Amino acid sequence: MMFTDAPLHHVGVVQPDEEQALAVMETLGLREAYRGYVPQFHALCIFTHAAQGSPVEFVIPDDGPLMKFNKGAGGLHHLAFEVPDLRALSADFERQGLRMLEPEPVNGAGPFLCNFLTPAATRGIIIEYVQPLPNG
């Protein structure tokens, strides 16, 4: 699976707290589409509406390594691409000697499974892959 085959699903931005995330949303005129909590990543995730493009996901950690992202200040965190079969993609990467952060895909903040390619494979760029769930 190449990037040319996977459309951009969303852009993830870490914010230190919900108040700051909502302030950025207000400044940019973004409206909340939905929110969810991802226990594996200790984070509340707020997705925005996307008129023509991809939504922004505001990631608000309450524990774990994301709290230290960019020295606690937050910022642009990841690009997420949509794939039809996350497990097949993970197996493909494994055959290439690459690995995902989680041993198995996890439930995302929305109706999708997700996993991240280790940043070492992309020279520090954090890439997430998401697989929409049926009826999602």
Language model regions located:
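Aromatic-residue detector
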Residues: 3, 18-21, 30-33, 54-57, ...
